[in-house]
């Protein structure tokens, strides 16, 4: 049957069909090869936006640094990072005036967190720059290595202490004249295998001690490693993101805790809430502006876009903000919070793997590591790369580039949101002192601005004033990419608003399907995703029913568990057919055992085992859920588990689903190959730690420590 796609949309307002234009089906693009070029782009661009600043040299590391703060006021519309300190401080003061006590209360909340947080907070998170090995490692490993080195250098670090004590060690380590570290290297040798008599390459991991002088250590402590951001949809060019090392992470965490606490109290902030809560917050602001504008005023909304938000922000500005926010607090607290921005003002960007060269004629490939870029002959490079390298050379030290201005992606999302909201806050009539006024929403670098005024000239004047005010604090609203509309239709953080939020269902598409954890969890997650989308995203009953059928089909295909009476032959069909024939009540078999699907859109909230329990043969129940069955998972099963689902936008989010322990809740065994690598020792430590924890728990059931999420966790193993 031919379907004319335009007919589908005849009854649908254009805004509701917007989700069909999003690039969310199919695989997202991944980057291959080195991120060195993208990182050099970031460094060069950041310096270009601040080029009229003052150059200084860092006395400890010898790194050249550019400081654009209080630089010249912009004369054109080019993006620039010349924030004016007094303007930022004034914006902070007005923010506090409009929200009495907000900074004071947030400081008190943060102080409590600072005193209670334990070091293992830093084991959360994915890849982290491990300064001891000079490459990325899982967070738990990088932390363990750092603590080990600190210990061997007479610092008091321990894995279960308070984070604040670990940060004291970090501060002390920076004063040391030298630090001794253990590095790993691989030895390869060819030996004859006794059994097969073939030659094999044996790898051994060697360890050697290395001393870092103060300068080298500081450079490593201030280094952000860079990678290419993967899976970004709808973009032609890739871009670089940063992973900081353990020295910086703890300080950043406390600053973000403070900023998060402030954001929670600001009605214009799109962080840290999400989902329906965020939509409600936004709808309130819109309602406020529309109610006031009904008869006398015009109201327009800008769907805003900022040019290179991160690259024009400045850590020195964040330092000024923190100094102001914490001005009545005890010194120790002010010091702890001011270290993160100070470290960022002195940060170094690691250029990544370097470049790969290959000669077609001689079939040779060679890697040029980033360290060599400072003095290699440029004739080997193409023109664009040559320009990049020439530009970055004055900034290079040991394969890292000095990068004082700019923030790198995703480091101070909360704090930069506070800065954005402080400008939105200045739109109140008591501050504009004229007929126009504004309000809006800010979520990291994304914003929506609602301007009200008696006539079009007033709207224009309001937008201009907002634009110029932003320039004064280093925020550059893009005139090309922002657009203005009558209030009632706009987009903010991929939520489309048209007299209420329109469901952008395509964003959820990537999370449909089989997760690949195990048969039990996958079934549960699959139906929960469909249920959640019926609740939150306008997934209609007919579409949901179809999604469910497709999911079951996909699930059977993945686990090769087609119905017992099917003709499809797979490597499981022999066993499943036998089970089908032996079973009296066939409706009681789980789908993963070749049973029929009993789900429909009315019973998605019931776990499959519960749905079919009454229908099961007694001996099948016994095999499926008998705690003495060696295949039933013995760890205490919480009734609710968390799955990681991948929406199209933003980070992977956690989703709860019901977990019933059966023979299908298996946990795959770890891949053997880790046992031959340098990670092996870590693995053994971790198992030891786990055993001790389990013992401890048996004796003290009320103990309230957290199990570490180490590299042995499921997701890492996958």
From Swiss-Prot:
UniProtKB keywords: Eukaryotic host gene expression shutoff by virus, Eukaryotic host transcription shutoff by virus, Host cytoplasm, Host gene expression shutoff by virus, Host nucleus, Host-virus interaction, Inhibition of host RNA polymerase II by virus, Nucleotide-binding, Nucleotidyltransferase, Phosphoprotein, RNA-directed RNA polymerase, Transferase, Viral RNA replication, Viral transcription
Motif (Nuclear localization signal): 187-195, 203-216
Post-translational modification comment from the UniProt entry: Phosphorylated by host PRKCA.
InterPro entries for this protein: RNA-dir_pol_NSvirus, RNA_pol_PB1_influenza
Catalytic reaction list: RNA(n) + a ribonucleoside 5'-triphosphate = RNA(n+1) + diphosphate
GO BP, sorted A to Z: symbiont-mediated suppression of host gene expression; symbiont-mediated suppression of host mRNA transcription via inhibition of RNA polymerase II activity; viral RNA genome replication; viral transcription
Chief location: host cell
Span list, region Disordered: 50-81
Compartment(s): Host nucleus; Host cytoplasm
Superkingdom to which the source organism belongs: Viruses
Region Promoter-binding site: start-end pairs: 249-256
Enzyme class: transferase
GO cellular component: a single term: host cell cytoplasm
E.C. number: 2.7.7.48
A Pfam short name: Flu_PB1
Domain RdRp catalytic per the UniProt entry, residue ranges: 286-483
GO molecular function per UniProt: nucleotide binding; RNA binding; RNA-directed RNA polymerase activity
Comp. bias regions, Polar residues: 55-64
Quaternary structure (record): Influenza RNA polymerase is composed of three subunits: PB1, PB2 and PA. Interacts (via N-terminus) with PA (via C-terminus). Interacts (via C-terminus) with PB2 (via N-terminus); this interaction is essential for transcription initiation.
Protein task: RNA-dependent RNA polymerase which is responsible for replication and transcription of virus RNA segments. The transcription of viral mRNAs occurs by a unique mechanism called cap-snatching. 5' methylated caps of cellular mRNAs are cleaved after 10-13 nucleotides by PA. In turn, these short capped RNAs are used as primers by PB1 for transcription of viral mRNAs. During virus replication, PB1 initiates RNA synthesis and copy vRNA into complementary RNA (cRNA) which in turn serves as a template for the production of more vRNAs.
Protein family per UniProt: Belongs to the influenza viruses polymerase PB1 family.
Protein name according to UniProt: RNA-directed RNA polymerase catalytic subunit
Native source organism of the sequence: Influenza A virus (strain A/Guinea fowl/Hong Kong/38/2002 H5N1 genotype X0)
Species lineage: Viruses, Riboviria, Orthornavirae, Negarnaviricota, Polyploviricotina
Gene that produces this protein: PB1
């Amino acid at each position: 049957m031919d379907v004319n796609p335009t007919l589908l949309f005849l009854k649908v307002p254009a805004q509701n069909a917007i989700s069909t234009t999003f690039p969310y089906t199919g695989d997202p693009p991944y980057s291959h090869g080195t991120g060195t070029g993208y990182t050099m782009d970031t460094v060069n661009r950041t310096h270009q936006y601040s080029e009229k600043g003052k150059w200084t040299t860092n006395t400890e590391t010898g790194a050249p640094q550019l400081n654009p703060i209080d630089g010249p006021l912009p004369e054109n519309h080019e993006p620039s990072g010349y924030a004016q300190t007094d303007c930022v401080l004034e914006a902070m003061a007005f923010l506090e005036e409009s929200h009495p006590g907000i900074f004071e209360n947030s400081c008190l909340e943060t102080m409590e967190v600072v005193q209670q947080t334990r070091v293992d907070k830093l084991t959360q998170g994915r890849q982290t720059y491990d300064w001891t090995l000079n490459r990325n490692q899982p967070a738990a490993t990088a932390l363990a290595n750092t603590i080990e080195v600190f210990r061997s250098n007479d610092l008091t670090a321990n894995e279960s202490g308070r984070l604040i004590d670990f940060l004291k060690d970090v501060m002390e380590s920076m004063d040391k004249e030298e630090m001794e570290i253990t590095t790993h290297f691989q030895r390869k040798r060819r030996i004859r295998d006794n059994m097969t008599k073939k030659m094999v390459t044996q790898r051994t991991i060697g360890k050697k001690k290395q001393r870092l002088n103060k300068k080298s250590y500081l450079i490593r402590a201030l280094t952000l490693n860079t990678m290419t951001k993967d899976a970004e949809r709808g973009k032609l060019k890739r871009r670089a993101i940063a992973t900081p090392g353990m020295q910086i992470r703890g300080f950043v965490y406390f600053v973000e805790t403070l900023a998060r606490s402030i954001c929670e109290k600001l009605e214009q902030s799109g962080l840290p809430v999400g989902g329906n809560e965020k939509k409600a917050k936004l709808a309130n602001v819109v309602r406020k502006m529309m109610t006031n504008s009904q008869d006398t005023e015009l109201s327009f909304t800008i769907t805003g876009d900022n040019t290179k938000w991160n690259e024009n922000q400045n850590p020195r500005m964040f330092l000024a903000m923190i100094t102001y926010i914490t001005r009545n607090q005890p010194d120790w607290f002010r010091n702890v919070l001011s270290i993160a921005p100070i470290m960022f003002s002195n940060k170094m960007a690691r250029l990544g793997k370097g470049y790969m060269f290959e000669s077609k004629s001689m079939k040779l490939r060679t890697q040029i590591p980033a360290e060599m870029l400072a003095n290699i002959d440029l004739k080997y490079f193409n023109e664009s790369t040559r320009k990049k390298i020439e530009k970055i050379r004055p900034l290079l030290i040991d394969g890292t580039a000095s990068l004082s201005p700019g923030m790198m992606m995703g480091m101070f999302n909360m704090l930069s949101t506070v800065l954005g909201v402080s400008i939105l806050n200045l739109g109140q009539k008591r501050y504009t002192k004229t007929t126009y006024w504004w309000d809006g929403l800010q979520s990291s670098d994304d914003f929506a601005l609602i301007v009200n005024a008696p006539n079009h000239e007033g709207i224009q004047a309001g937008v201009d004033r907002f634009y110029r005010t932003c320039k004064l604090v280093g925020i550059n609203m893009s005139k090309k990419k922002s657009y203005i509309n009558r209030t009632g239709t706009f987009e903010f953080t991929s939520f489309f608003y048209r007299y209420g939020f329109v469901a952008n269902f395509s964003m959820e598409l990537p999370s449909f399907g089989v997760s690949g954890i195990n048969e039990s969890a996958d079934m549960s997650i699959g139906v929960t995703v469909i249920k959640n989308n019926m609740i939150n995203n306008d997934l209609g009953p007919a579409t949901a029913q179809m999604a469910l059928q497709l999911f079951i089909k996909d699930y059977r295909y993945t686990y090769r568990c087609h119905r017992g009476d099917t003709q499809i032959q797979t490597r499981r069909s022999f066993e499943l057919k036998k089970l089908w024939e032996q079973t009296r009540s066939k409706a009681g078999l789980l789908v993963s055992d070749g049973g029929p699907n009993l789900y429909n859109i009315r019973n998605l909230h019931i776990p499959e085992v519960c749905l079919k329990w009454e229908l099961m043969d007694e001996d099948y129940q016994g095999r499926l859920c008998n705690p003495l069955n060696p295949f039933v998972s013995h760890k205490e099963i919480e009734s609710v588990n968390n799955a990681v689902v991948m929406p199209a936008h933003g980070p992977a989010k956690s989703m709860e689903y019901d977990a019933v322990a059966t023979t299908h809740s298996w946990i795959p065994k770890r891949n053997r190959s880790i046992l031959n690598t340098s990670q092996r020792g870590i693995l053994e430590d971790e198992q030891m730690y786990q055993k001790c924890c389990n013992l401890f728990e048996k004796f003290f059931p009320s103990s309230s420590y957290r199990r570490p999420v180490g590299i042995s966790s499921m997701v890492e193993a996958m």
